[in-house]
């Protein structure tokens, strides 16, 4: 039962605990139109979990540190966020190595948020509250976004279905690679790397997150050399090819200029970095839809707030926001690569990006049922420490609506870049054929690759070079409800 103070007592000057100010309502039944956020809270010593949850609700909606009489000039009972449930987090507290943590569920009325604005949504949900003294640590784990609010967003500019139609590529994952080294190449040498990768069988090549316009290579030179490579590789192979031209810059005006130049050169795709901010991302997504351009997002900077389990924000929330904002691609983990990624958590990320309707799945970190209405699907990108010898695992874990990006696994091939691309394309085609023939490609994966390598020297060399490479480290972000270990290869 709520312990809120009501009537004249509620508006007397002074400080009242958030729990008694109306921000804790255990009997509250969320409306279909409410936005619900689920936080992982570590309260300060001596602070009840309900008070900590109420404090988060208050500070992320209408409250300040003391009673203000101007509350009476608003429909404050409506506009207050309402913490309505707290649950102890499994495997925390007494008898464990971790302080006691709680899952806190908070409902927000839809009228608290500007339609179609990720910036306004985040200003409340992850604004001042993360520095609030009442909690020792705070992490946003998941959100339920009502359809009424989703419909105010554009969603992905292109979507998976239209992207495949434009590329004329179906029934398999797409293949890509990031140009390496990411910094230092001249424009001409950079373009040569792009050509070799595409000519060898990749669908895409990619700029890395921090290649923009530096003294060693101006952005315009890079665009010209890359598109020359794309056009030559397309003519040589008869396939539609692309290169993610990174238009990230210091101002929106510069980003629009670079995007327009990419369009004028015939590019099918441009790229931006997560660090440009939510408003800039939405702006570029609107431009991309207007100009029939695929929009790739590199999640640069994400791990600064998503990697630690007790504070920050789970990547699944970023996945939801970016689908709303309108990107077509986003890096979402590999399971078997060099970057952080628990198998169960990554399944939750991929489902969030690709499903029309996401059911509750606690083992995958999905705490809310989510109807995505008519928003397009996002194509997840798997990159970072993957190679041809893992192809059966990648197909099994990630499915076919994914882009597999083999950067070092292409450019580091002992016979060169084109041979590295050939190895990856042959490995993928062999695995897809085995799957389509009804073979158990997961169990027989190594054998399938060895059979293909008998007539493909680049694949044989790739398997020999990287067969013993593993990144078997413990994940920091694991499921709370199902014990799991990072996959080994």
Curated annotation (Swiss-Prot):
The record marks 338 as: Transition state stabilizer. GO terms for biological process: reductive pentose-phosphate cycle. It catalyses: 2 (2R)-3-phosphoglycerate + 2 H(+) = D-ribulose 1,5-bisphosphate + CO2 + H2O; D-ribulose 1,5-bisphosphate + O2 = 2-phosphoglycolate + (2R)-3-phosphoglycerate + 2 H(+). This is Ribulose bisphosphate carboxylase large chain. It comes from Nitrosospira multiformis (strain ATCC 25196 / NCIMB 11849 / C 71). The active site is at 180 (proton acceptor), 298 (proton acceptor). The keyword Lyase applies. It comes from the Bacteria. Mg(2+) binds at residues 206, 208-209. Keywords: Calvin cycle, Carbon dioxide fixation, Lyase, Magnesium, Metal-binding, Monooxygenase, Oxidoreductase. Belongs to the RuBisCO large chain family. Type I subfamily. Pfam families: RuBisCO_large, RuBisCO_large_N.
């Amino acid at each position: 039962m709520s312990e809120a103070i009501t009537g004249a007592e509620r508006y007397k000057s002074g400080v009242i605990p958030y729990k008694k100010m109306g921000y804790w309502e255990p009997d509250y039944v969320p409306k279909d139109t409410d936005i619900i956020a689920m936080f992982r809270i570590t309260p300060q010593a001596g602070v009840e979990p309900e008070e900590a949850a109420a404090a988060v609700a208050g500070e992320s909606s209408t409250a300040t540190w003391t009673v203000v009489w101007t509350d009476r000039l608003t429909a404050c009972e409506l506009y207050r966020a309402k913490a309505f449930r707290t649950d102890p987090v499994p495997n925390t507290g007494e008898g464990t190595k971790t302080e006691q943590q709680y899952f806190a569920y908070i409902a927000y009325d839809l009228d608290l948020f500007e339609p179609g604005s990720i910036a306004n949504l985040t200003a409340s949900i992850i604004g001042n509250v993360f520095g609030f003294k009442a909690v020792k640590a705070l992490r946003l784990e998941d959100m339920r976004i009502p359809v009424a609010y989703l419909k105010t967003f554009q969603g992905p500019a292109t979507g998976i279905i239209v992207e495949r139609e434009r590329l004329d590529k179906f029934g398999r994952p797409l293949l890509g690679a990031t140009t390496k080294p990411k910094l230092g190449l001249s424009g001409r040498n950079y373009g040569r790397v792009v050509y070799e990768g595409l000519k060898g069988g990749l669908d895409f090549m990619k700029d890395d997150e921090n290649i923009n316009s530096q003294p060693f290579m101006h952005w315009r030179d890079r665009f010209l050399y890359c598109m020359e490579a794309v056009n030559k590789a397309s003519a040589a192979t008869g396939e539609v090819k692309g290169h993610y031209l990174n238009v990230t810059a210091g101002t929106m005006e510069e980003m629009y200029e670079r995007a327009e130049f990419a369009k004028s050169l015939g590019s099918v795709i441009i790229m931006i970095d997560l660090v440009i901010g939510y408003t800039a991302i939405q702006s570029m997504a609107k431009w991309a839809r207007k100009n029939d351009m695929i929009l790739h997002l590199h999640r640069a900077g994400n791990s600064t707030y998503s990697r630690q389990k007790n504070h920050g924000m789970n990547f699944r929330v970023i996945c939801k926001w970016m689908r709303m904002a309108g990107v077509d691609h986003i890096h979402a983990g590999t399971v078997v690569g060099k970057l952080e990624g628990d198998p169960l958590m990554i399944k939750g990320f991929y489902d969030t990006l690709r499903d029309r309707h996401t059911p509750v799945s606690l083992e995958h970190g999905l705490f809310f049922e989510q109807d995505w209405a008519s928003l397009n699907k996002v194509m997840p990108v798997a990159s970072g420490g993957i190679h041809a010898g893992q192809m059966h695992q990648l197909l099994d874990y990630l499915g076919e609506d994914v882009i597999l990006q083999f950067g070092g696994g292409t450019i580091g091939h002992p016979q060169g870049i084109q041979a590295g691309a050939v190895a990856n394309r042959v490995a993928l085609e062999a695995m897809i054929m085995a799957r389509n023939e009804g073979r158990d490609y997961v169990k027989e994966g190594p054998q399938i690759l060895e059979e293909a390598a008998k007539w493909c020297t680049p694949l044989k060399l790739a398997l020999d070079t990287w067969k013993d490479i593993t990144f078997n480290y413990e994940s920091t972000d694991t499921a709370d409800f199902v014990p799991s270990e990072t996959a080994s290869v």
